[in-house]
Amino acid sequence: MAASQCLCCSKFLFQRQNLACFLTNPHCGSLVNADGHGEVWTDWNNMSKFFQYGWRCTTNENTYSNRTLMGNWNQERYDLRNIVQPKPLPSQFGHYFETTYDTSYNNKMPLSTHRFKREPHWFPGHQPELDPPRYKCTEKSTYMNSYSKP
C-alpha cells in the first residue's frame, strides 16, 4: 500500500514546484511587484537590476510620461500631444451617422493646432499652458511672497 501525503504537505510541494518553474521561466508568471511610484522591479538574476529604473545611468532617467502610471487616463486625455493633434478629416459616409441634434447644436469651429506655445515648466510633466489664466498668477514661491513689496 502506498503511503499517502497529508493535504498540507502536498499543497506546500505544489507551491514549491510552481515557484521553481516560475523562477526558471520568468515569462510564464507575474511575480513582479510595483511600488507607489509606478516603477516595476524584477530580480531574475544578478544582471537584471542594471536594466531597471534607478540603476541605469541615462540622461532621461527621470523624465515623466503619461505611460508611467497604469490607468492614468486623465493625463493621457489632456496631454498636450493629444490635444494638439488635428482631428481626422470627415469621411464621405460621415453624414449617414450625423443626427439632427448634432447638426443643429454642435457647430464647433475647427481649433488651430498652434494655439499652445510651450511655456517654462517646473518639472518634465508640468504643462502650464493648460492652466486657466486665474491660476497663472499664483506661481510665486513663499520666498517671493515674503520678500516682495506689499
Swiss-Prot record:
The organism of origin for this protein: Homo sapiens (Human)
Any single biological process term in GO: flagellated sperm motility
UniProt lineage: Eukaryota, Metazoa, Chordata, Craniata, Vertebrata
Pfam name, any one: CFAP68
Keywords: Cell projection, Cilium, Cytoplasm, Cytoskeleton, Flagellum, Nucleus
Family: Belongs to the CFAP68 family.
Gene: CFAP68
PANTHER family from the UniProt entry: CILIA- AND FLAGELLA-ASSOCIATED PROTEIN 107-RELATED, EXPRESSED SEQUENCE EH456644
Main location: cytoplasm
Protein's job: Microtubule inner protein (MIP) part of the dynein-decorated doublet microtubules (DMTs) in cilia axoneme, which is required for motile cilia beating.
Protein's name according to its UniProt entry: Cilia- and flagella-associated protein 68
Annotated segments matching region Mn 2: 140-150
Gene Ontology CC: axonemal A tubule inner sheath; axoneme; cilium; nucleoplasm; sperm flagellum
Region (Mn 1): 99-110
UniProt subunit comment: Microtubule inner protein component of sperm flagellar doublet microtubules.
Protein location: Cytoplasm, Cytoskeleton, Cilium axoneme; Cytoplasm, Cytoskeleton, Flagellum axoneme; Nucleus; Cell projection, Cilium
InterPro entries tied to this protein: CFAP68, CFAP68/107
Record-annotated membrane-spanning stretches: none
